[in-house]
Amino acid sequence: MHKTRLALSCLLGSLLLSGAVHAAEALVPPKGYYAPVDIRKGEAPACPVVPEPFTGELVFRSKYEGSDAARSTLNEEAEKAFRTKTAPITQIERGVSRMVMRYMEKGRAGDLECTLAWLDAWAEDGALLTTEYNHTGKSMRKWALGSLAGAYLRLKFSSSQPLAAYPEQARRIESWFAKVGDQVIKDWSDLPLKRINNHSYWAAWAVMAAGVATNRRPLFDWAVEQFHIAAGQVDSNGFLPNELKRRQRALAYHNYSLPPLMMVAAFALANGVDLRGDNDGALGRLAGNVLAGVEKPEPFAERAGDEDQDMEDLETDAKFSWLEPYCALYSCSPALRERKAEMGPFKNFRLGGDVTRIFDPAEKSPRSTVGKRD
């Protein structure tokens, strides 16, 4: 009996120590985020004026306003109003992504300083922290967090340590990311399963990016928990019931669900948490079903109420940016790798920018990743 108690005591102590060590370990991104800054001759473009920090109510019209339950018919008037009101948010998302890509590629200090000036201005004003919002507003909050924290990660973890000379700005920015991340968690927690869809997956990516950028494990843990829920929603054939509700856009929304889930899985694996086995390999099953559906959409049409699938979105190569983390997580076939190379390089500002340079840096386009004008 004494030996049994001693063994149990030792086992408990070992588990507690293991948990403490795990909790103490700093959160890290996938290895591609450690890439050094390339240095080229020349000056950065003049720093544009900072987009007005958005501190007001996050209450916006939905571009699907007036649509039926499938939420698949575009309301052009509402979309125009939405884009006008959210312009400052979209400007900082796209602008930060563009400047970080350009800085990592060309190493011009002006791009780094401009990026930090923009983020610092929004941080100091407490942008995106309002508790007055509607569904479209809280959606914009999590998209913006994923975009900004996702791009910032490349600066924070680069082996060139570009943030070392800007400790105060980095501290303010990261503190702001953590606050926005906490609010995103409040926005998207405790939803009934029937309301958990791609929005929750994108919220998980945003919180994961913020968690790693700020080394806040509660944020990391929440993102992982949302992944568990998402994986549990994938049925045995690789369908997401709540995305099938989008009827003619069911396939497009299954595809749209994959980028954030792949990113969460990639970041989790970098920190010793392998999510690929969740629900008997749900993530791989979902990806395989989407790839098959792109070639033969009839199964999606059948499951979505005999609705012919709208393939317009799927004709845009950038919609498949999830292939980069996918092929880092799984053994992609030579044919799929060749297809990925033909479609890339992939740049998705909502994932923090140039996803190809992060996950498959050998697969670079000969042209600039930020366009000829840059």
From Swiss-Prot:
Belongs to the polysaccharide lyase 5 family. The lineage of its organism: Bacteria, Pseudomonadati, Pseudomonadota, Gammaproteobacteria, Pseudomonadales. It is found in: Periplasm. It comes from the Bacteria. The keyword Signal applies. This is Alginate lyase. GO terms for cellular component: periplasmic space. It catalyses: Eliminative cleavage of alginate to give oligosaccharides with 4-deoxy-alpha-L-erythro-hex-4-enuronosyl groups at their non-reducing ends and beta-D-mannuronate at their reducing end. GO terms for biological process: alginic acid catabolic process.
